[in-house]
Amino acid sequence: YMDSSPVVAITGHVTTAQLGLDSFQEVDITSVTMPVTKHNFLVRRVEELADTIRTAFQIANSGRKGPVLIDVPKDITALKCEYTPKEPEPIPEPPMPDQGWFLKAVELIKSAKRPFIYAGGGVISSEASEELRAFAEKVDAPVSCSLMCQGGFDELNHRYVGMLGMHGTKTASCCIR
């Protein structure tokens, strides 16, 4: 889940009675997707569905954001149960890093001969475009944005040098040499 995108995918499955029998169209989707998701759920009782969905959104949005899969067998989708709506629980704020790390970063940036800013998708998700612009001005550094940061820095700004990598610009590549 390298993009850190909070996604909750709800997939359908064979009936509960057919699970694990190599039935037609049965795929162990929770195992298949395990390497690329933060967490997977297989709902075995309709009474678990609401809490599972709520928990999935909590997991997808807390810490490093990422995808969560909820697999629901076909027979569960046809059932009904009592449901009491609940207020969503707030997503906990990530802990602040140790102040010492910030001070160390400031010293490293101050001592840099050719500072360069490579901005990622966190600029977009934290709505920090203005802070990025101000930081680039303050340290007098060129800025390159990853694919996930497109739109996070004004491309008409004289500090913007384009993307890095396969679809990047020669200017951006020269800045990191």
Regions found by a protein language model. Give the residues of each.
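N-terminal alpha/beta PP-like core and its mobile active-site loop of ThDP/TPP-dependent enzymes
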Residues: 1-177
